[in-house]
């Protein structure tokens, strides 16, 4: 620990140059600082002893001399020898066994016992001090080869001799394209042949593909494009920049709006004869009927006041950005008002037929009959979003590379191919819910149909008295070696017999519920009609429990060590279990009027929701407190010595009573609310209004007698060793627990068709639908020609001695491999500053900045006698 502390001190000394925290450090001629046991922080040199075993110097040169080592030259001593720079004080631990450089001899002991030492300096070499920022350049002997160290994250890029040809390496996912010699004859490689399995019509297969198959991307389920009757007119939706016009009465045909760059052709009602639109510079020559009164012409900045027929009711005016289209009576054909820069077109009476003139570049659009509804035109980049009726299921859009999955008619039955390792799962009727598979150690929780009435579990020694239904014909008992003869219905068509290890599962008509076939050592159970509810059979040592009428709810029995897991209704909030010393904080419903708190020995039973009837476990001496519905107002009982205190309304301020020794404080004005000061032992007596119903306080030993409502059903109290039977709500269906040796026989719904279990050597005979065309069976030596999908690129097989030339993608940068004797030339990042290590005998030659003034060096014969002040 001492060494660690001193090393931390050294770190502080080296870093805090500006504070000159160098006290307690001794400087040697090389510029290293050693203090206390800090020599353990340095690496030992070759040939030296480990720290603490022998006084052998451990030295590591410092390349940078910190500022604090520029010693101060003011001493209180009368004699100030040149070249000696003692510190003003020492660290508390100074004087411990310390390692110094070879020429250094310690000069100080503990302060209290200090005696001056006559110190000699052989061949004194000047100690050099540098400015704080100076980094001296180290020179090395010509033969020195530095060992370079790198940062941990540095990944070196090796260099190679000119003649080196690297062996290329590739990423793990790279699949090389193999080239072959011209004389190579490709031998196709096939997967082991396995006939295609066929399945009943209701089987929905999981399709698998060969390893090289490039799977089509999976998309959201395909929804076909809805087809509409010829008269269907879709409602078009527009991009976000579209500003829809207000909706009008059915007879109004709206003016369409388009993207900003669109110049629309205005559509008009059927009776309107259109006026041409011209460029802004076009001035038409207007002709009028004899009765027309011309409208005066105005300067360009004039904002015309629109004139309307006498029956027109004008709409309010809006701010400039708003372009209001006024509504007019049916016979009026009006143009809208526009911003100031717009040159308005003249308005004419309804019967006016203008002579239209066009600019030379104008291409007229054809005129249509009155019933024609024009098709909207959009900018070239506009892609309309079509809206559909609520029942429309859109067809999804796919990327260009999407290859659609073929759709088939509902009656299509696909023929599925599987990989060699595929193990077919038995097919079930559509209503069948598959049985989950679990690890070998899994003990299943048996699930029953809603009508299932569980039978209790018994200890292993229980012998049951078996009861059967009136129609039950008992199965005779056979010796263990008996192999039962399977019975079939009259319509059964027997399948061919198989070798001994195989037991064929008979096929039955659809209504028949057959039992599975088992290995030879299995004692088969009898098969029953679907409506039969089997009686569970038990081992010979089992003692049966009598059967009860359907309305009987059995009391579950458990082994002596069984601790039942209590099940509560969904609304139940469980009470946490606490250590015996826990004092629970009681929570109440919102309408609950709390009873008074009790002294420490009393353990309060929390109240639960109204529907929950819970039995809490208490010590034997405890008399349980009843729980009430939220609206119950308890009648409080008191001991005979109780004197009730009156209760008061909320606005009542009680008159405080004081003990005889109380000295009242002076009275204050009404606004002042004074808190009385009382002696420490004072307990004020509260006064209450007449309507107050007091809460009783009891002595510590008082056990309250609780009164209950008439509908309350008390639960008995039990001794501490009693393990109570859990009470459940009426709808609770208990989970039956069985002894460890009990193997449960699962019960299934009437429609369940069991999955047969076979011997390990059993190979099932596949059943095929009527449309199945079987593939021929081949001899073991037959190698079929494999058919692949169109996109399949076969991977050829080669002779064992063939070494393919691998082709790589253009962006691949190979990682070369080298001969074992190759020593790469290491390259470094530009910012890397190597940490240089030196041989043990190397003494660096120090170089100095131009402004450096060396301190005086002394001849070898100089032996200064150092005297220290008395406070040392």
From Swiss-Prot:
Top-rank lineage group of the source organism: Eukaryota
Protein name per UniProt: Adhesive plaque matrix protein
Residues covered by region (Nonapeptide 2): 213-221
Segments of this protein annotated with the region Disordered: 273-781
Location of region: Nonrepetitive linker: 21-41
General function of this protein: Provides adhesiveness to the mussel's foot. Mussels produce one of the strongest water insoluble glues. The mussel's adhesive is a bundle of threads, called a byssus, formed by a fibrous collagenous core coated with adhesive proteins.
One GO cellular component term noted in the UniProt record for this chain: extracellular region
InterPro entries reported in the protein's UniProt record: Adhesive_plaq (IPR002964)
Cellular localization per UniProt: Secreted
Sequence repeat copies, ranges: 124-133, 134-143, 144-153, 154-163, 174-183, 184-192, 193-202, 203-212, 213-221, 222-231, 232-241, 242-251, 252-261, 262-271, 272-281, 282-291, 292-301, 302-311, 312-321, 322-331, 332-341, 342-351, 352-361, 362-371, 372-381, 382-391, 402-411, 412-421, 422-431, 432-441, 442-451, 452-461, 462-471, 472-481, 482-491, 502-511, 512-521, 522-531, 532-541, 542-551, 552-561, 562-571, 572-581, 582-591, 602-611, 612-621, 622-631, 632-641, 642-651, 652-661, 662-671, 672-681, 682-691, 702-711, 712-721, 722-731, 732-741, 742-751, 752-761, 762-771, 772-781, 782-791, 792-801, 812-821, 822-831, 832-841, 842-851, 852-861, 862-871
Signal sequence annotation: 1-20
């Amino acid at each position: 620990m001492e060494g660690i502390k001193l090393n931390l001190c050294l770190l502080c000394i080296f870093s805090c140059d500006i504070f000159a925290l160098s006290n307690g450090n001794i400087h040697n001629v090389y510029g290293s600082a050693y203090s206390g046991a800090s020599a353990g922080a340095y690496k030992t040199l070759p040939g030296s002893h480990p720290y603490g075993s022998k006084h052998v110097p451990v030295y590591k040169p410092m390349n940078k001399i910190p500022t604090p080592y520029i010693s101060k030259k003011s001493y209180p001593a009368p004699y100030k020898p040149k070249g000696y720079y003692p510190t003003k004080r020492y660290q508390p631990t100074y004087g411990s066994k310390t390692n110094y450089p070879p020429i250094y001899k310690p000069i100080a002991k503990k302060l209290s016992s200090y005696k001056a030492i006559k110190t000699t300096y052989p061949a004194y070499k000047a100690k050099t001090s540098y400015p704080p920022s100076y980094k001296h350049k180290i020179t090395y002997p010509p033969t020195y080869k530095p060992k370079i160290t790198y940062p941990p994250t540095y990944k070196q890029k090796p260099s190679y001799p000119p003649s080196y040809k690297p062996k290329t390496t590739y990423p793990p996912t790279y699949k090389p394209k193999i080239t072959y010699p011209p004389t190579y004859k490709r031998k196709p490689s096939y997967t082991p042949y396995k006939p295609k399995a066929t399945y009943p019509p209701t089987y929905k297969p999981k399709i698998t593909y060969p390893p090289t198959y490039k799977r089509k991307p999976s998309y959201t389920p395909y929804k076909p494009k809805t087809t509409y009757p010829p008269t269907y007119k879709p409602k078009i939706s527009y991009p976000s920049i579209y500003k829809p016009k207000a909706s009008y009465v059915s007879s109004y045909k709206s003016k369409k709006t388009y993207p900003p760059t669109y110049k629309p052709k205005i559509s008009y009602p059927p009776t309107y004869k259109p006026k041409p639109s011209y460029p802004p510079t076009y001035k038409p020559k207007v002709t009028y009927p004899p009765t027309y009164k011309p409208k005066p012409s105005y300067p360009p900045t004039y904002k015309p006041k629109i004139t309307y027929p006498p029956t027109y009711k004008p709409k309010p005016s809006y701010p400039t950005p708003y372009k209001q289209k006024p509504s007019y009576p049916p016979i009026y054909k009006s143009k809208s008002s526009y911003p100031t820069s717009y040159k308005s077109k003249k308005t004419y009476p309804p019967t006016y037929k203008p002579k239209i003139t066009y600019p030379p570049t104008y291409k007229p659009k054809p005129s249509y009959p009155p019933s024609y509804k024009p098709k909207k035109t959009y900018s070239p980049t506009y892609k309309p979003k079509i809206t559909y009726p609520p029942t429309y299921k859109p067809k999804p859009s796919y990327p260009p590379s999407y290859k659609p999955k073929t759709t088939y008619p509902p009656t299509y039955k696909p023929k599925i191919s599987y990989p060699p390792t595929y193990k077919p799962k038995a097919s079930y009727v559509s209503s069948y819910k598959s049985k989950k598979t679990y690890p070998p150690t899994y003990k299943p929780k048996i699930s029953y149909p809603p009508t299932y009435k569980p039978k209790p579990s018994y200890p292993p020694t229980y012998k049951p008295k078996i009861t059967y239904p009136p129609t039950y014909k008992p199965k005779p008992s056979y010796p263990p070696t008996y192999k039962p003869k399977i019975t079939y219905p009259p319509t059964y068509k027997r399948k061919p017999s198989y070798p001994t290890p195989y037991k064929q599962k008979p096929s039955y008509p659809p209504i028949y519920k057959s039992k599975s076939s088992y290995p030879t050592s299995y004692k088969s159970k009898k098969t029953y009609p679907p409506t039969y509810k089997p009686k569970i059979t038990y081992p010979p040592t089992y003692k049966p429990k009598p059967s009860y009428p359907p309305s009987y709810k059995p009391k579950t029995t458990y082994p002596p060590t069984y601790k039942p897991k209590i099940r509560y209704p969904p609304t139940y909030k469980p009470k946490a279990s606490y250590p015996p010393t826990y004092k629970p904080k009681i929570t109440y419903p919102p309408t609950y009027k709390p009873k008074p708190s009790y002294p420490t020995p009393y353990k309060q039973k929390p109240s639960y929701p109204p529907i929950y009837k819970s039995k809490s476990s208490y010590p034997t001496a405890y008399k349980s407190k009843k729980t009430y519905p939220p609206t119950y107002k308890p009648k409080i009982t008191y001991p005979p010595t109780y004197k009730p205190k009156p209760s008061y309304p909320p606005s009542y301020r009680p008159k405080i009573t004081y003990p005889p020794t109380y000295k009242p404080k002076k009275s204050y004005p009404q606004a002042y609310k004074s808190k009385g000061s009382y002696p420490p032992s004072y307990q004020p007596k509260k006064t209450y209004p007449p309507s107050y119903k007091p809460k009783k306080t009891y002595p510590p030993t008082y056990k309250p007698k609780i009164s209950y409502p008439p509908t309350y059903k008390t639960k008995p109290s039990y001794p501490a060793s009693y393990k109570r039977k859990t009470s459940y709500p009426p709808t609770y269906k208990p989970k039956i627990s069985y002894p460890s040796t009990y193997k449960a026989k699962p019960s299934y719904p009437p429609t369940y068709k069991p999955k047969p279990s076979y011997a390990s050597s059993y190979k099932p005979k596949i059943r095929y639908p009527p449309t199945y065309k079987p593939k021929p069976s081949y001899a073991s030596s037959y190698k079929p020609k494999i058919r692949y999908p169109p996109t399949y690129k076969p991977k050829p097989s080669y002779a064992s001695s063939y070494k393919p030339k691998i082709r790589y993608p253009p962006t691949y940068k190979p990682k070369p491999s080298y001969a074992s004797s190759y020593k790469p030339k290491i390259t470094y990042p530009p910012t890397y500053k190597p940490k240089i290590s030196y041989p043990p005998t190397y003494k660096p030659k120090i170089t100095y900045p131009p402004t450096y003034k060396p301190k005086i060096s002394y001849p070898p014969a100089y032996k200064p006698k150092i005297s220290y002040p008395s406070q040392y």
